């Protein structure tokens, strides 16, 4: 009979620093211990959940003595919800940790030769800063310890909110989210209340059954609101009644869409978004430029910080008005158009066709005539022949997804030999890997992080490069 593993409890652990992925760090007999939701200065008892040769992971079993820096979390869902994990950490300490994260990835781990990293650009708003949130309907919500699951009806087990970390089939029923301004919370709570009252079924991710699947709320600084409601199957009568009820309750919704998504995953990128009522898009403005945002469009989710991010990008590009600029991973062409007035010509490339259509419309609406946009996989479009046909870039701006750039793309960039590059990244680790390749022919001249997501460990980083 196998012997049951005995729990490892570490007492009076002193938390020393903030570590990678938002965890905190302590040292125990030469080994590193990573602890969720801890703050430097905390003294805690920790239950170890993973033990390897050089490190351990665990969670706080008992708070012996809280750090003088520790703050009371402002959200009632803290600790279960997977977002905003740094609520107990003062914002200044969050910024310091993100600055350190960039240094660690580029210098300590990446061994790149970089100048002094500029101070991180903080966010003026640390709550209600997102312009987009997605909520999931589930028949299996997270049941708390003080609840009797057996006594709950099937409807009482329904939830509408966010997936719980490590439990793909569990959803936290969110009462109030501090990430997106109203009417986001009001819309979500109304839809849940209506659905329960009318007996509409929520999605079961294990059995792949149920009516309501997920919902996306997008908002703008101008007060536009877009709602995309996703159903697992069609039921014209029930769907129409729900959409009409939403439209009547929230006249401020300017774009009301629905999707019938019967496939295995809940992504809508390959699904038809059907406009039920209102305008086909919402709009954001930046320095007099108007940007169309459709249901599938990518747009930086922190609008005010996006302006700061793009301003740093433009500053690092050092444009004089005569340059040909390539904007790779252009999205809806925001950066491309943001720098177009300081460039001779801008070429934007993006994988999502709908985003490129929006980019073209945006350029036309803004009276911009020096931007050309192309849709397709970057490694397939950006070839040596493409560069020869469209002209050698003087400046390349890159803003790739978390995975970074494909090796083939890096080769073409090096062959194109632009005078300068600006690399914008949401993942300093993959950025450091790519920079090692690019630094065969380039030197890093400036680095500046930007905080787009307060209360999380995520950080954007902007790097300027100059040809050797």
Model-predicted segments: where are they?
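Extended interfacial segments that mediate partner engagement and assembly in macromolecular machines
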Residues: 61-72, 79-201
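Short, conserved phosphate/pyrophosphate- and ester-handling motifs at nucleotide-, phospho-/glycolipid
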Residues: 41, 180, 302
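Terminal RNA-binding accessory module
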Residues: 1-77, 372, 380
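Carbohydrate-binding surface patches
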Residues: 216-219, 225-235
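Internal alpha/beta scaffold segment
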Residues: 169-205, 209-211, 233-257
């Amino acid at each position: 009979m196998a012997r049951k593993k005995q729990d490892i409890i570490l007492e009076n652990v002193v938390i020393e620093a903030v570590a990678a992925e938002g965890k905190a760090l302590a040292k125990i007999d030469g080994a590193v211990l990573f602890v969720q939701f801890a703050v430097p200065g905390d003294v805690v008892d920790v239950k170890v959940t993973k033990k390897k040769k050089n490190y351990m992971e665990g969670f706080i079993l008992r708070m012996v003595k809280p750090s003088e820096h520790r703050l009371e979390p402002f959200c009632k869902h803290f600790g279960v919800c997977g977002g905003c994990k740094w609520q107990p950490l003062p914002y200044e300490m969050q910024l310091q940790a993100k600055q350190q994260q960039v240094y660690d990835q580029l210098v300590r781990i990446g061994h790149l030769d970089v100048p002094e990293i500029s101070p991180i650009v903080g966010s003026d708003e640390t709550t209600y800063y997102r312009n987009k949130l997605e909520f999931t309907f589930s028949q299996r919500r997270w049941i708390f310890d003080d609840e009797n699951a057996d006594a709950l009806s099937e409807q009482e087990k329904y939830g509408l909110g966010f997936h719980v970390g490590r439990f793909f089939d569990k959803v936290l029923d969110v009462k109030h989210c501090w990430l997106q301004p109203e009417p986001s919370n009001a819309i979500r709570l109304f839809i849940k209340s209506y659905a329960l009252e009318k007996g509409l079924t929520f999605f079961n991710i294990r059995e792949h059954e149920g009516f309501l699947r997920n919902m996306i709320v997008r908002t703008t600084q101008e007060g536009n609101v877009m709602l995309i409601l996703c159903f697992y199957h069609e039921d014209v009568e029930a769907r129409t009644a729900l959409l009409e009820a939403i439209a009547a309750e929230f006249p401020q919704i300017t774009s009301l869409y629905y999707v019938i998504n019967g496939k295995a995953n809940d992504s809508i990128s390959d699904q038809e978004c059907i406009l039920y009522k209102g305008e086909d898009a919402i709009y954001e403005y930046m320095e007099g430029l108007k940007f169309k945002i459709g249901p599938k469009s990518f747009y930086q989710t922190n609008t005010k910080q996006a302006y700061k991010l793009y301003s740093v990008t433009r500053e690092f590009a050092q444009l004089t008005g005569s340059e040909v600029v390539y904007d790779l991973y252009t999205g809806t062409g925001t950066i491309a158009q943001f720098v177009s007035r300081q460039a001779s010509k801008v070429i934007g490339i993006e994988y999502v066709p709908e985003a490129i259509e929006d980019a073209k419309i945006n350029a036309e609406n803004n009276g911009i005539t020096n931007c050309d946009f192309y849709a397709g996989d970057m490694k397939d479009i950006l070839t040596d022949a493409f560069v020869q046909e469209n002209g050698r870039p003087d400046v390349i701006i890159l803003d790739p997804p978390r995975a970074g750039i494909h090796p083939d793309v890096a080769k073409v960039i090096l062959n194109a030999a632009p005078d300068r590059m600006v690399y914008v990244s949401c993942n300093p680790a993959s950025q450091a890997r790519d920079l090692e390749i690019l630094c065969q022919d380039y030197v890093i001249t400036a680095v500046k992080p930007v905080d787009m997501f307060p209360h999380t460990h995520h950080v954007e980083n902007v790097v300027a490069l100059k040809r050797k």
